[in-house]
Amino acid sequence: MPALDHPLIDQFLDALWLEKGLSDNTRVSYRSDLALFNGWLQEHSVSLPDAGRDLILDHLAWRLDQGYKPRSTARFLSGLRGFFRYLLREKLVAIDPTLQVDMPQLGKPLPKSLSEADVEALLQAPDLGEAIGQRDRAMLEVLYACGLRVTELVSLTLDQVNLRQGVLRVMGKGSKERLVPMGEEAVVWLERYQRDGRAELLNGRPSDVLFPSQRGEQMTRQTFWHRIKHHARVAGIDKPLSPHTLRHAFATHLLNHGADLRVVQMLLGHSDLSTTQIYTHVAKARLQQLHAQHHPRG
């Protein structure tokens, strides 16, 4: 893609040099980043000062697809933020769209994820002869099918579930509501649990909690974590786990099977695409491993 200069880029860099004594290397890097972004915007018929948050996020996704490193993208965002602060100060724009874009977190460890075989073993671990086992199987199926946060899962109530349409109405961070499809397997196990195991678990006690504890109350995060570790031991999984292991597996497996990053972002309830992007590194690493193992020239 051709990089396109813009007079505002030169004005910004001149102002930055006068104010902060910008080094030649930083000046060249900022110019290159902003010119590349301007060229990308031109292909989308948008002028540089008119770039909004959504377009900036789209460009970040494009950079990721092109193989740009997180440190390079962090430098680009740093320059872009300075550029829009300059435009705002000069009254050339009304708002700074970069305020709503998070910086990439450098050096952040990749989320722990399980293989699809590990997930299958974990899902089959609960004892279905017991009500608590039926609850746990349905709970794990829903968690893996929907990629919920643990707090979202344990706080689910009956009125948030639509089995006929196969969707959950989830209340996420910041009281933001989203609809998440469950898939056929999760619906089947949830129907079975609600028909049999849940009533036995409650033993006549009233509750609108979808996955109640043995006392009929909302399950705590600690109890959920205890159940996950128990089932992992039963399944023979000795990999490091976290309460969000199945959420990470949900995102990674979707991307491994070709899901669009934006779709995964919406399903996870991430407000910013950069939060979702870290999963693409996990997915790409797995794909590279498979290529090396199975391709004749790997």
Curated annotation (Swiss-Prot):
From the Swiss-Prot or TrEMBL record, give the protein name. Tyrosine recombinase XerD
Note the HAMAP family from the entry.
Recomb_XerC_XerD (MF_01808), Recomb_XerD (MF_01807)
Q: Which CDD domains match?
A: INT_XerDC_C
Which Pfam family, any one of them, does this sequence belong to? Phage_integrase
Question: What are the record keywords, sorted?
Answer: Cell cycle, Cell division, Chromosome partition, Cytoplasm, DNA integration, DNA recombination, DNA-binding
Concerning its family, UniProt says: Belongs to the 'phage' integrase family. XerD subfamily.
Q: What is the lineage of its organism?
A: Bacteria, Pseudomonadati, Pseudomonadota, Gammaproteobacteria, Pseudomonadales
One GO MF annotation is: tyrosine-based site-specific recombinase activity
General function of this protein? Site-specific tyrosine recombinase, which acts by catalyzing the cutting and rejoining of the recombining DNA molecules. The XerC-XerD complex is essential to convert dimers of the bacterial chromosome into monomers to permit their segregation at cell division. It also contributes to the segregational stability of plasmids.
Under the heading PANTHER family, the entry gives: PHAGE INTEGRASE-RELATED, TYROSINE RECOMBINASE XERD
Offer one example of a GO biological process linked to this entry.
cell division
Name of the gene: xerD
Q: Pinpoint the Tyr recombinase domain residues.
A: 109-292
Annotated active site residues, numbered on this chain, are: R149, K173, H244, R247, H270, Y279 (o-(3'-phospho-dna)-tyrosine intermediate)
Q: Which positions, given as ranges, span the membrane?
A: none
- Could you state one GO cellular component term attached to this entry? cytoplasm
Subunit: Forms a cyclic heterotetrameric complex composed of two molecules of XerC and two molecules of XerD.
Q: Which residues form a coiled coil?
A: none
Location comes to: Cytoplasm
InterPro entries in the cross-refs:
CB, DNA_brk_join_enz, Integrase-like_cat_sf, Integrase_catalytic, Integrase_recombinase_N, Integrase_SAM-like_N, Recomb_XerD, Tyrosine_recombinase_XerC/XerD
Q: Where is the Core-binding (CB) domain?
A: 3-88
Q: Which PROSITE patterns match?
A: CB, TYR_RECOMBINASE
